[in-house]
Amino acid sequence: MAPRNSLEAGAHVVLFNRDIKPGGLAEYGIFPTKHKMKQGLRKQFRAILAHPRLDYYGNCSIGEKGALTLADVQTLGFDALVVAAGAQGTRQLGIPGEDAIGVMHAKDVVYHYNHLPPFSQRALPLGKRVAIVGMGNVMIDIAHFLLRLRACVEEVVVVARRGPAERKYDAKEYRYIEPFVDQQALQHEILRLRPRLEAVGQDVAVLMAEMTGNGQATRPPDCPGRLTFRFLASPHRMLTDAAGRVRGLAVEENRLVRQQGDVSARGTGEYVELPVDTVIFAIGDRVDESLGLPYARGQFVTNPHPDAADPLVSAYQTYDPILSGTNFASGA
């Protein structure tokens, strides 16, 4: 944590936070029932906020659209400005219909069930058949929420660009959704993809055992929904009705390509329509450019006039050199 490191270095820290409560994703990004993890992180934040050399200002957004701009903060007399805001922008795929009614992004759901304003005040209009695009831990949390706490959801369809071997979620997290997995449908899906999986040397029997387990997970009696997978499928466009609401998701069938040990997906030009009425993208976020920092995708922004005496000049050097002093500001 930037504030703790600065305090340990003897600095006086002023912490600006967009939210009222401190914690960021530690507070608003973790599934609500993971009490032990949340309490442990909250204890750390309480200790930091209690430090006599830290001043905390919550409900104060920083950026071009915020209460203060970065330029404003730089005029307040600090010797250094540390931005620890993470990626708060929404990542878009740029496909047709991405702004249709019924299309959401992970933060819309995660911040809603974690009670972060203004997301918690917004309605969450879910249909009966929900597609979640993505195969990471966030997908697990959203599927868990939909199937365990939203009785209106009859089916969650996980749409993955690559195959079961490339799943990104932690194995221990899978136990939260395993009781809802339609094991027969999962086996059928893996067998459907056998030629494409074996073409890159993947063992279907091993994948089947890893994904299906013993099939003995107990489904909660009051949760009738099921979870299915659609692997090797890339979102192509939203299908909408006359009112602009989602009625389906068109996906492109993919094949796997192995290059230098890495497996990637390539489109086949074949398309399939999935009948869903809600689509949630859990594909990560992007930097919010309105924060006011120099931004370039896939690279660091470095000092245009680097210090040649810096031994790490070829690896990294800050854009705005830090001056000597003991007063630091941190944005979160």
Model-inferred region functions:
Residues 84-85, 99, 106, 133, ...:
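Short, well-ordered coil/turn residues at beta-beta hairpins
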Residues 74-80, 125, 267-277:
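Core beta-strand elements of the Rossmann-like FAD/NAD(P) dinucleotide-binding domain
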Residues 144, 148, 153-154, 321-332:
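Internal hydrophobic alpha-helix adjacent to the cofactor/substrate pocket in enzyme cavities
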Residues 89-150, 301-320:
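Glycine-rich dinucleotide-binding loop and its adjacent helix/turn
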Residues 78-80, 84-91, 254, 276-289:
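Glycine-/small-residue-rich beta->alpha transition segments that form the dinucleotide
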Residues 44-98, 102-103, 221, 228, ...:
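Feature captures the FAD/FMN-dependent oxidoreductase FAD-binding
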Residues 2, 8-14, 57:
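Structural/interface elements that position substrates and couple domains in central-metabolism enzymes
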Residues 10-18, 22, 28-29, 37-38, ...:
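Dinucleotide-binding/catalytic capping subdomain of oxidoreductase cores
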